[in-house]
Amino acid sequence: MAFDTKLLEIIACPVCKGKLRFDKENSELISTAAKLAYPVIDDIPVLLENEARELSLDEVQKWNS
């Protein structure tokens, strides 16, 4: 079973409450506003700030383009 992208309509970044985008290649949910990437493990998003990694400036620009 794969991550259900329909979840993106109802979940939000726990830090900024903004929209999330799914990065299928890295299995992460991206919040450009908070500059964080949340892992998706076994198709379950881990929306904990301490589990997220910080996005680089290049990554933020890539997702905002």
Curated annotation (Swiss-Prot):
Q: Which residues form a coiled coil?
A: none
- Matches recorded under InterPro entries: Trm112-like
**One Pfam family here:** Trm112p
Q: Which domain of life is it from?
A: Bacteria
Cross-referenced Gene3D superfamilies:
2.20.25.10
Instruction: Give the CC-aspect GO terms.
Output: cytosol
For this chain, the family text in UniProt reads: Belongs to the UPF0434 family.
**HAMAP family recorded for this chain?**
UPF0434 (MF_01187)
Q: What is this protein called?
A: UPF0434 protein PSHAa1659
Origin organism is: Pseudoalteromonas translucida (strain TAC 125)
